[in-house]
Amino acid sequence: YAAQLLTAGGSIAGILQTGAPVSWVRVLQTLPEAIWQCPGQIAKGLVRLAKIHFCHVRTFRDVKKIEARGSGKLEAVSFTDHKGITHHVDAAVLMVHEGLIPGVHPVLAAGGRLEWDETEMCFRPILDEWGESTVPGLFVAGDAARIGGADAALHSGALAALRIAMQIGHADEKALATKIHFHRKKFRQAMSVRPLVTTLSRLRLEQLSPADDVMICRCESVNAGTIRRAALTGSGMPDQVKAFTRTGMGACQGRQCSLPLSVLLASTHNRSVAELGLFRVRAPFKPLKLGELASLSHESDIQ
């Protein structure tokens, strides 16, 4: 996004990297396979990095204690770099992005099971080789399954479509063998760059467990301290804490705060995030305009 913004004529005051320190040994282990299987993606990434470099955008590593400052609106951002030096930078916009996390809420709402990926620090839906979830007939592809880029999403969607065609009797696996082989091969190629991406952008889990005064649920104005106190009441499970604090009940329906809440509860009770899971979510999964709701003409559409 930074490279695209620069190409469009925008200006960037700085890029703050909050992820875990990069293991260059791991980079050297994953880079050859990524170059061999996905040279186009690697080249595209290098071009974008070059764009950022030649536009003289300052990049800070191992950043901590990011604070948005201003009176009524954002005026500046303060942070501490890897040397412990505190910086104050004037800015009108602050964009925050932590990790590469699939959108699991639709699967979760449908009753599908999730699994915790310790390497990528996120929950993912449990799927078979075709993308079918633990709910029979519910297929998941693209960024709802795992973040792998546009090419991976395309081929995972194609595999799901082929499996559906077989399930409804439109074709058998033998007749579709060539297409199945093609899309599986292309999907594996596209995903071969993922270990490198994970190594370079690994989420620091403590970033999701900040100080008490940090806002976790912006929709309902719930900070980390409120969640920690609620965690000590009752079972301390995500659904109960959601009910106690209204975390995840706002417009975003937990898309921003569900994982941080589970991480906070895990650290408070010294339990694993995988054991706690995420709180239940309700539709709509994204803000719905009144006009969009009114345009539903049939009762079946509304259901």
Tell what function each PLM region has.
Residues 1-245, 251, 255-264, 268-302:
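Residues forming the flavin
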